[in-house]
Curated annotation (Swiss-Prot):
GO cellular component: endosome membrane; Golgi membrane; synaptic vesicle
Species of the source: Mus musculus (Mouse)
Quaternary data: Interacts with ZFYVE20. Interacts with STX6.
UniProt-annotated location(s): Golgi apparatus membrane; Endosome membrane
Protein name: Vacuolar protein sorting-associated protein 45
Pfam family, one: Sec1
Source taxon at top rank: Eukaryota
Keyword field: Endosome, Golgi apparatus, Membrane, Phosphoprotein, Protein transport, Transport
């Protein structure tokens, strides 16, 4: 179950099926992103694709010597653009691939528009999602719900993305969902409807143990997306932001022109592939090794190219050297900027207190540490409010809850009202009343013993103590212990055996910390394959945008009186 490989295969097949000759790849905004995640432009150029165009671009030239490969989402707009294109074709022949199921009526409309008979084929290739890592996919949807319910357009897009994912991996799963989330049940029903309607597409070879789709809701764990991160990929997303593998470095002080935007892709960058799940300290020493290796391989200025053999060796090595030079400068810049931000924002200290809020249960120590950091001028308003949110979520119903006082401290620190208001919005979004699970206190004896032993041994790294709630959920699922009264099956049948192929989807967005959890479970659990997906991949900033978009904040009030009243009521 490798989503990058699945999408890559589709694109390779499109290009191969169009035969030899020069080609143009005609895409829409979304499929452009889907393709760019798995192929670089130079890789596609090697396959005789010399031009990349958008179907909605008005000023494309007529180029009858090119074949057109169209890879488009089956939307009304795209079908209309194609109809216009086929009435006045700009290319010699058209190979049309839709990223999802296309209606018969749309195919009929296209056939009627194709008066010049330029269409060679129309097919469905189910690459209708963003393949981020081999075990991680996203739909790039921010703000999928209105209150607790789906935005209808986003429900439709998510259903399409999830069913395409299942088709691309050739899985017809049983479905379980988080009972506490109406949105999870609704999505499960929509996926099930598509499977029933398009049953012929889902007729795959039966496996002994059917695959399982588990649908979860971000509301059940609002802690994970609020934490600072210390592994490479997650940290880059948290501090710099990753958008379809691209990182905007234009705000970095003294940045050179060619490094204003860089691409981090494990497919084309060996250093990144080997380091994306390692912690920041290891990255530092690995980058030093990369630099030293680069110094050794670097062509020396005084190097004499005396013989033809010398020159040949230099020319052969130069592309590799050039690539290595680009890799070195890119990672040195990224790691340098992460380092600068950690120091400037005092993130080591901030993160230690975040971890205490997420993992420990000592209220007075936590409160003292949060108050101390709120007084620290190096701590930004963003980090200050994140600490107060973590406190508010953890100690929401604590008898000595001091949230009103912390809100006053935020105001004294000069934190903007828009941030202060978000504290109650986050509690409204993912507080105790909403959660189907208990995030903070292990209930069973085994979990309590584990936590006690963990406390005795001490934690190897205070900055990475936290494990997402997803870890516990998947651990129980793999061992056949996930409670059916909390995660029921959709429909009458249940799974007798432990699942082997698991697709987990998080409504409201997944995180790179959860992707790391899935990566580690895949690595350490023989016979189990897990793929994680989400409506988007969050960092703290985008998660707070998700909370705002849900509209729940409009019901919550910032005043400390309201906060304390609700604390008493609960």
């Amino acid at each position: 179950m490798n989503v990058v490989f699945a999408v890559k295969q589709y694109i390779s097949k499109m290009i191969e099926d169009s035969g030899p000759g020069m080609k143009v790849l005609l895409m829409d905004k979304e499929t452009t992103g889907i393709v760019s995640m798995v192929y670089t432009q130079s890789e596609i150029l090697q396959k005789e694709v010399y031009l990349f165009e958008r179907i909605d671009s008005q000023n494309r030239e007529i180029m009858k010597h090119l074949k057109a490969i169209c890879f488009l989402r089956p939307t009304k707009e795209n079908v209309e653009y194609l109809i216009q294109e086929l009435r006045r074709p700009k290319y010699s022949i058209y190979f049309i691939y839709f990223s999802n199921v296309i209606s018969k009526s749309d195919v009929k409309s296209l056939a009627e528009a194709d008066e010049q008979e330029v269409v060679a084929e129309v097919q469905e290739f189910y690459g209708d999602y963003i393949a981020v890592n081999p075990h991680l996919f996203s739909l790039n949807i921010l703000g999928c719900c209105q209150g607790r319910n789906w935005d209808p357009a986003q429900l439709s897009r998510t259903t399409q993305g999830l069913t395409a994912l299942l088709l691309s991996l050739k899985k017809c799963p049983m479905i379980r969902y988080q009972l506490s989330s109406e949105a999870a049940k609704r999505l499960g029903e929509c996926v099930k409807q598509v499977i029933s309607k398009e049953y012929e597409l889902f007729e795959f070879r039966r496996t002994e143990v059917p695959p399982l789709l588990l649908i979860l809701d971000r509301c059940d764990d609002a802690i994970t997306p609020l934490l600072n991160q210390w592994t490479y990929q997650a940290m880059v997303h948290e501090l710099l932001g990753i958008n379809n593998n691209r990182i905007d470095l234009s705000r970095v002080p003294g940045i050179s022109k060619d490094l204003r935007e860089v691409v981090l892709s494990a497919e084309n960058d060996e250093f990144y592939a080997n380091n994306m799940y390692l912690n920041f300290a290891e990255i530092g020493s690995n980058i030093k090794n990369l630099m030293e290796d680069f110094q050794k391989k670097r062509p020396k200025e005084q190097q004499k190219l005396e013989s033809i053999a010398d020159m040949k060796a230099f020319v052969e090595n130069y592309p590799q050297f050039k690539k290595m030079s680009g890799t070195v400068s890119k990672h040195v810049t990224v790691v340098g900027e992460l380092s600068r931000l950690v120091s400037e924002r005092n993130l080591l200290e901030v993160s230690e207190v975040e971890q205490e809020l997420a993992c420990q249960n000592d209220h007075s120590s936590a409160l003292q540490n949060v108050k101390r950091l709120l007084q620290n001028p190096k701590v930004t308003e963003f980090d200050a409010v994140r600490l107060v949110m973590l406190y508010a979520l953890h100690y929401e119903r604590h008898s000595s809850n001091s949230l009103p006082g912390l809100i006053v401290d935020l105001r004294s620190k000069g934190v903007a009202e828009k941030y202060r208001k978000l504290v109650s919005a986050v509690v409204e979004y993912g507080g105790k009343r909403v959660r189907g699970s208990d995030l903070f206190s292990p209930k069973d004896a085994v979990a309590i013993t584990k936590q006690f032993l963990k406390g005795l041994k001490g934690v190897e790294n205070v900055y990475t103590q936290h494990q997402p709630f997803l870890h516990e959920t998947l651990d129980h699922l793999i061992k056949g212990r996930l409670k059916e009264n909390l995660y029921p099956y959709l429909g009458p049948s249940t799974l007798r055996d432990r699942p082997q192929d698991i697709i987990v989807f998080i409504i409201g967005g997944a995180t790179y910390e959860e992707a790391l959890t899935v990566y580690n479970l895949n690595r350490t659990t023989p016979g189990v394959r897990i793929v994680l997906g989400g409506t988007t991949i969050h960092n703290t900033k985008s998660f707070l945008e998700e909370v705002l978009a849900s509209g729940l904040h409009s019901r919550s009030r910032e005043s400390s009186q309201a906060t304390s009243r609700s604390a008493n009521r609960r």
